[in-house]
Regions:
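Active-site region of the double-stranded beta-helix
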Residues: 1-90, 107-113, 118-155
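Histidine-centered metal-chelating micro-motifs
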Residues: 92-95, 99-105
Length: 155
């Protein structure tokens, strides 16, 4: 059983060469457009080359690929299988990233565009929710990355 979830889209109309999608996310109160114009990693590795991750405490992400492909690494110490690698494309639906989940994303050479239809609670503060955490300085994160076999999701 996986802790990784997706919010699927609904096709509500198709015409020649055009598809209309309902990509609504119930209770979403923020939308972030994240563009990787080429090969990119977010957040980037730190100064010593260690992986860095974001972790939100007051936001649930719903990351949906609009163009290209994106790979997410998810680490959540509370999950039975705490390390996941998720490959996304436009047909995957929105990857749900709950609070207290370390996450980072990687785009290939062609780049990618993702919309994050987030749900933010009243305590959300952008100045504290987007501070990268390095595996070099977070013992728990380092331990999981070096000892747990990742669950690979390819959709």
């Amino acid at each position: 059983m996986s802790e990784v979830n997706f919010k699927k889209h609904r096709v509500f109309r198709e015409t020649q060469d055009v598809i209309f999608y309902d990509i609504s996310v119930e209770d979403s109160n923020a939308a972030d457009l994240v563009v990787h114009e080429g090969a990119a990693t977010s957040p980037p590795d730190d100064a010593v080359g260690a992986k860095q991750f974001y972790i939100h405490y007051h936001q649930t992400d719903h990351n949906r690929v609009l163009s290209g492909e994106r790979t997410f690494e998810l680490v959540n110490p509370e999950w039975r299988y705490p390390y996941h690698i998720v490959h996304l494309n436009r047909g995957s639906g929105a990857l749900v990233i709950p609070p207290k989940t370390y996450h980072r994303s990687v785009s290939p050479e062609d780049g990618s565009i993702v919309i994050n239809q987030a749900i933010r609670d009243d305590e959300f503060d952008a100045s504290t929710e987007f501070i990268p955490v390095s595996a070099a300085t977070c013992e728990e994160l380092y331990r999981i990355l070096t000892t747990e076999k990742p669950v690979i999701h390819t959709l």
